[in-house]
Amino acid sequence: MISKLSSRKEHLGVVAPSAHADKTAAKRHAVRNAPDVSVELPYKAPYDWGAMLSVFRAHQLPHLESVDDRGYERVVRTSQGMGWFRVAEGAKEHSLQLSVWNGGEEDIANISQSARRMFDLDADPDVVREAMNADPYLFSIWKRHPGLRVTRSWSGFETMLTTILGQVVSVSFGRTLADELMKAGGTKARHPKNGELIHLFPNAEQLLTADLSVVRTSESRRTAIRSLAMLVADGTLEWEHPLPPKELRKTLLGVPGIGAWTAEYVAMRGFHDDDAFPATDYALKQELKRHAEVDVNRVRPWRAYAAIALWKSYAEAKGTPYDPVV
């Protein structure tokens, strides 16, 4: 019985907490180089692929996500256990290529849908450009950078928690805190590509019983994390069928430790709200102070793209890399 159970866990990529990695095990769990399935993800040009990669690179989750100069990779659960996918420039014009390892046709539809959201591939740049035309300064930015898109996330739950952990700390330390959270509550698994032991991002139920004292953040943020986990566990919050915008914000703002910036940012990246605008963001406030004539309400319901444009303008003015996250 123990032998069969252990084999089942290994097939799923899950290992017992007491398991130890070695080189032989790593090789045994590594997946072959060729993907099981690849599909093209078309988009309407223009599209700034480099800008999208730079954002994902800066905020990749330790061990679960990786970004190089040509693409983005992520570990995911598939119908065959633990797998991963990669998004890179496609062979066809105006497309990205999605490749999935250790997965089948039944996985590609779900991963494809998520990837399209993450990389904002269904946005119509002509519609966004027309909206930006309502404000002269925003339109001037958009004319210089017509391929900007809103970077979304794989999971709204991840976005909520990493955003809370990232409050008033550097981006790099925010990633460290995310790693600590994953180790505190996430399931141990074999990385399907290299066989290394990793921790998956914990689900809501795992976080409700996890010891969060090992995460070097404030007690108020730990409380916020538990509160959000409860809202997800009881079905109040979900990202496939999100609450209406006003109700979503009301629910988020009802959690102690979540303010206007967090609620708007989570709505934009985690719940795919094209009209979200984190007005209290430092960079956005600086840009609106420099350009007092700007009225982002002119471009509704596309204010998320106004935020992207202003973040880009701020980076240009400061001579810093583009990164729509503070």
Summary of predicted features, one role per range:
Residues M1-V326:
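HhH-family (HhH-GPD) DNA N-glycosylase catalytic core used in base-excision repair
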